[in-house]
Amino acid sequence: MSNGIDKVVLAYSGGLDTSIILKWLQDEYQCEVVAFCADLGQAEELEPARAKAEKFGVKEIYIDDLKEEFVRDFVFPMYRANTLYEGVYHLGTSIARPLIAKRQIEIANATGAQAVSHGATGKGNDQVRFELGYYALRPDIRVIAPWREWDLTSRDKLFAYAEKHGIPVPTDKRGEVPYSMDRNLLHISFEGKALEDPWVEPDEEMFVLSVSPEKAPDQATYVELTFRQGDLVAIDDQEMSPATLLAKLNQLGGRNGIGRLDLVENRYVGMKSRGVYETPGGTILGVAHRAMESLTLDREVAHMKDELMPRYAKLIYNGYWFSPERAMLQTMIDASQTFVNGKVRVKLYKGNVVVVGRQSENSLFDPAIATFEDDKGAYNQADADGFIKLNALRMRIAAMLRNGPKV
């Protein structure tokens, strides 16, 4: 069943699902498979994935370190918008997919592949995110989505296929099949198993990046974050690369019990799903960036950003990173960050990120006007009388017309 496909680039992790897919592609499509593994900060040794692919005769294997590109070109632009999906989710999975799709298409072009493939299920958002990216970057690309084609429709069938072809089935330290997890430098997500009941509290042993707030230190940690045009550039006055900065924030946040999130979200494909997330560094970054904006952004610009943020977040969540509307919003967001420069001091304590200071050469905060003390005439309080009456005019007119003049 080649269908004119001689070569396919598979987004390959070395895990159970994509290892099964690799073998299935070889058997069903009788084509050459190019294995591509993206290092986005999974904190895993990726060379075993190479060995697994080689075991199945794969000749072209790409293991690419994309951590800096991921944070610089995807995570940081997203955080300039203070992006949260449905008010809480930091989009750690969503924002990784366009970069993987981009690199897959680049490899397909370089190797002469006619198709790309991924391991996303037919029930989830990732199939949409991957494939919208593929088609935006190469309209004629062929897409193979095994979960929408094969008859391996249950875990038991997957395990039987794996056993038949000598593919090891991973287990946790209890000897059980682990949660469905996705990890990168921004977050780790957990789905499936007991979490499919939204009433069940997650097992503490499940968490990877953070201690529980109850077990976090009793002493607060103070951190200073430096921003330049909306992007984090230094921690405690030490400049680092984007990926190194986020990794450092993950360490600081994780040890202080920061960044855990348990939510039921609305998937693009129409169903609700329950996920548990750890985003320690991203949580700190989001709080600090908003604090920096509070000092440096014009009021109406800040409010407009807040109005547009849910739309921007939905575009990323649904897979429209490469769409013209996301690019348009990004241009506006980036323009708003010109003066978002300075420092924010935060206190990290038992799951909380508390802003305790902010300063900027571009500050719009004028203490001479805002003071409760004598402002030496900088602000004439009597001017407020006309301001209030003009703003009340429409409501006064409506009240008079509806209620009639008093006799």
Curated annotation (Swiss-Prot):
Cellular localization per UniProt: Cytoplasm
Pfam families: Arginosuc_syn_C, Arginosuc_synth
Gene3D superfamilies: Argininosuccinate synthetase, chain A, domain 2 (3.90.1260.10), HUPs (3.40.50.620), Single helix bin (1.20.5.470)
Annotated positions binding L-aspartate: 121, 125-126
GO biological process: argininosuccinate metabolic process; L-arginine biosynthetic process; urea cycle
Keywords for the protein's UniProt record, in alphabetical order: Amino-acid biosynthesis, Arginine biosynthesis, ATP-binding, Cytoplasm, Ligase, Nucleotide-binding
Coiled coil: none
Residue positions binding ATP: 11-19, 38, 119
GO CC annotation: cytoplasm
Leading EC class: ligase
EC number: 6.3.4.5
Binding site for L-citrulline: 89, 94, 125, 129, 180, 189, 265, 277
GO molecular function, one term: ATP binding
UniProt xrefs under InterPro entries: Arginosuc_syn_C (IPR048268), Arginosuc_syn_N (IPR048267), Arginosuc_synth (IPR001518), Arginosuc_synth_CS (IPR018223), Arginosuc_synth_type_1_subfam (IPR023434), AS_cat/multimer_dom_body (IPR024074), Rossmann-like_a/b/a_fold (IPR014729)
Sequence similarity: Belongs to the argininosuccinate synthase family. Type 1 subfamily.
Assembly and binders: Homotetramer.
Full protein name: Argininosuccinate synthase
Organism: Magnetococcus marinus (strain ATCC BAA-1437 / JCM 17883 / MC-1)
Taxon lineage: Bacteria, Pseudomonadati, Pseudomonadota, Alphaproteobacteria, Magnetococcales
